[in-house]
Amino acid sequence: MAQQAKAHVKMQRVSVSKAKLVANLFRGKDATLALGILHNTPQKSAKIFIKLLNSAIANATNNHGMDASKLFVKEIHVNEGPTLKRFQPRSQGRAYEILKRTSHFSIILEERA
């Protein structure tokens, strides 16, 4: 089995459905190509993925001695985190619930043969 480099980030204030749309853009691509795609993606979750991908590349080169130019995104997971519940006051004593959703991201890089 080839060596793998991992990076995780939790409790990010972006919904899972919106983050998965961005994750699907670079799943299976080379790491350098994925960074280029993310830099040209205007979504909020793209900035989180840029930091996460840079962290995974640094883990691969520093901890495992892998070549950064041969890395590709083997797996990427976007999972649902805890939902923060807030209330918006409305007229006549009512309150509407506002759900602030969070996400957990993880990425696994591997060296191409």
Swiss-Prot record:
Cysteine pairings via disulfide bonds: none
UniProt keyword Amino-acid biosynthesis, yes or no: no
Domain of life, per lineage: Bacteria
GO MF annotation, one: structural constituent of ribosome
Alphabetical list of InterPro entries matching this protein: Ribosomal_uL22 (IPR001063), Ribosomal_uL22_bac/chlpt-type (IPR005727), Ribosomal_uL22_bac/org-type (IPR047867), Ribosomal_uL22_sf (IPR036394)
A Gene Ontology BP annotation from the UniProt entry: translation
Pfam families reported for this sequence: Ribosomal_L22
Coiled coil spans: none
Keywords, sorted A to Z: Ribonucleoprotein, Ribosomal protein, RNA-binding, rRNA-binding
GO CC, any one term: cytosolic large ribosomal subunit
Family: Belongs to the universal ribosomal protein uL22 family.
Subunit structure: Part of the 50S ribosomal subunit.
Function: This protein binds specifically to 23S rRNA; its binding is stimulated by other ribosomal proteins, e.g. L4, L17, and L20. It is important during the early stages of 50S assembly. It makes multiple contacts with different domains of the 23S rRNA in the assembled 50S subunit and ribosome.
UniProt-recorded name of the protein: Large ribosomal subunit protein uL22
